[in-house]
Amino acid sequence: MKKAHLTVQSNSEIADRIYKMVLKGELVRHLTEPGQFLHLKVSDAVTPLLRRPLSIADVNFAADEVSVIYRADGEGTRLLAGKKEGGRIDVLGPLGNGFPVRRIEPGKTALLVGGGVGVPPLQELSKRLTEKGVNVIHVLGFQSAKDVFYEQECRAYGDTYVATADGTYGEKGFVTDVIREKQLEFDVLLSCGPTPMLKALKQQYGHKEVYLSMEERMGCGIGACFACVCRTGESDTSYVKVCLDGPVFKAEEVAL
């Protein structure tokens, strides 16, 4: 983990309340594992006190640039949405453990499933997998057409299916409906998104090799505050820290 000030290259709305921010700085050279995250200080003022954890969406090592995607819902992310080109942001990272790209052999097929703001980390993951010869299929889930983003970016690396809960774009239903109806075949499943989606994927495909990136509220981002603990399922008193031990876990390692 390193601490640095990165420069805002751009910051724009790409879907309903969904923003893409591109940051530049030497810290980017250390972002080698898809699925890790950055911890951004959103203001120089006393409040908001806590940093905001944002997953790494795309890395351009040649330009020392990293893209992060976030939904401007709360006070902190609304402050981020107001950041202008040329501004500086205090960043900690990379944090956490990412997806196991090295374990997936060339020629295998990986199914990447994202829901809402869980879609961004799949972009860099897809890029890294295809670079090593892994076949990639994407299934992206959103609430409505206005929420859809990153479809074309995913299509650049492999077949991509989009589902919306209200049926206003792509297939109507949930990501699990698409996987079943399209009869998608895969060797390994990697997913990031809301807990109900991850739970459904674990229930239906837990007999296969499945990796889940957990979305939990975080305080410190380094495992000190215990705000993001998740039960392991071994017992009612056995927990892991999502920020430190995760955010990516094998499906059987966590209770959902």
Swiss-Prot record:
Top-level taxonomic group: Bacteria
GO biological process: one example: 'de novo' UMP biosynthetic process
Record SUPFAM superfamilies: Ferredoxin reductase-like, C-terminal NADP-linked domain, Riboflavin synthase domain-like
Binding annotation for [2Fe-2S] cluster: C220, C225, C228, C243
Residue intervals of the FAD-binding FR-type domain: 1-101
A Pfam short name: NAD_binding_1
PANTHER family per record: DIHYDROOROTATE DEHYDROGENASE B (NAD(+)), ELECTRON TRANSFER SUBUNIT (PTHR43513), DIHYDROOROTATE DEHYDROGENASE B (NAD(+)), ELECTRON TRANSFER SUBUNIT-RELATED (PTHR43513:SF3)
Subunit structure, interactors included: Heterotetramer of 2 PyrK and 2 PyrD type B subunits.
Cited function: Responsible for channeling the electrons from the oxidation of dihydroorotate from the FMN redox center in the PyrD type B subunit to the ultimate electron acceptor NAD(+).
Family: Belongs to the PyrK family.
Record's protein name: Dihydroorotate dehydrogenase B (NAD(+)), electron transfer subunit
Taxonomic lineage from the root: Bacteria, Bacillati, Bacillota, Bacilli, Bacillales
